[in-house]
Amino acid sequence: MALWGVSDADESKPKYLSDADKKNCIAKSEGWVLKKTVGSRNLEEILVATGADLSVGIGQADIVEIDFVSTAFDKSDGGTLSAKVFFNENVTVSGTPQLSVTNGNEGTGSGRGPHVLSYASGSTTNELVFSLAIGAANAATNENDVLSIGANCVSLNGGTIVDLSLIHISEPTRPY
């Protein structure tokens, strides 16, 4: 069992984690590490020490989840559409990768979307934020529109995403 957990598959993460904790459990040189925020402090707890640099042993970093940061805004005022992409290990970003968001056009009218969110922050962490400013009274969205994120949603756009093993991630895809 010396190499238990040395795989990039979700099944390698500790089994007892809640769904929320699985998204915050990342591979680091120490092993599987759980990141938590308590008050204003960011804490990391080593859950499983592998005896080897897990961030190197698991291969290319993978997207484990994508969440919308902004869930609603007033169309008359405009707002920022943001999403957070979670990787299973820390990554370094250069340039401006992009995230595509599909608009189902459920509201009145048609022809809205897709929306392209540009990389905004998060390099050297496992959480990358992508954002798009939408101006006041813009036709980009309408009431009742449903926005979704597909499987092949991240494009490098001439930039790079590199994991701790210095592997350039050529086609970041979400797991579902």
What do the predicted segments below correspond to?
Residues 85-119:
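Short, surface-exposed alpha-helix to beta-strand junction/turn motifs within ectodomains of secreted
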